[in-house]
């Protein structure tokens, strides 16, 4: 199972770096920062499905 360490999030701004991650909501997040901010917003219900686009 793929995991991402989201300690230290949410961050107020994310870079435009593109390293896609696919969330358990079947949505592609542009990078770890965007994904981790969404994880925090979801109160931990969002998880990583896999690295790369959905």
UniProtKB/Swiss-Prot annotation:
<dbReference type="InterPro" id="IPR001239">
    <property type="entry name" value="Prot_inh_Kazal-m"/>
</dbReference>
<dbReference type="InterPro" id="IPR051597">
    <property type="entry name" value="Bifunctional_prot_inhibitor"/>
</dbReference>
<keyword id="KW-0722">Serine protease inhibitor</keyword>
<keyword id="KW-0964">Secreted</keyword>
<dbReference type="Pfam" id="PF00050">
    <property type="entry name" value="Kazal_1"/>
</dbReference>
<feature type="site" description="Reactive bond 3">
    <location>
        <begin position="16"/>
        <end position="17"/>
    </location>
</feature>
<keyword id="KW-1015">Disulfide bond</keyword>
<feature type="disulfide bond">
    <location>
        <begin position="6"/>
        <end position="36"/>
    </location>
</feature>
<feature type="domain" description="Kazal-like">
    <location>
        <begin position="4"/>
        <end position="54"/>
    </location>
</feature>
<protein>
    <recommendedName>
        <fullName>Ovomucoid</fullName>
    </recommendedName>
</protein>
<feature type="disulfide bond">
    <location>
        <begin position="14"/>
        <end position="33"/>
    </location>
</feature>
<dbReference type="GO" id="GO:0004867">
    <property type="term" value="F:serine-type endopeptidase inhibitor activity"/>
</dbReference>
<dbReference type="GO" id="GO:0005576">
    <property type="term" value="C:extracellular region"/>
</dbReference>
<feature type="disulfide bond">
    <location>
        <begin position="22"/>
        <end position="54"/>
    </location>
</feature>
<keyword id="KW-0646">Protease inhibitor</keyword>
<keyword id="KW-0677">Repeat</keyword>
<dbReference type="InterPro" id="IPR036058">
    <property type="entry name" value="Kazal_dom_sf"/>
</dbReference>
<dbReference type="InterPro" id="IPR002350">
    <property type="entry name" value="Kazal_dom"/>
</dbReference>
<feature type="glycosylation site" description="N-linked (GlcNAc...) asparagine">
    <location>
        <position position="43"/>
    </location>
</feature>
<keyword id="KW-0325">Glycoprotein</keyword>
């Amino acid at each position: 199972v793929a995991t991402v360490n989201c300690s230290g999030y949410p961050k107020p701004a994310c870079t435009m770096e593109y390293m896609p991650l696919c969330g358990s909501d079947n949505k592609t997040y542009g990078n770890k920062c965007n994904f981790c901010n969404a994880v925090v917003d979801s109160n931990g219900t969002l998880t990583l499905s896999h690295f790369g686009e959905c």
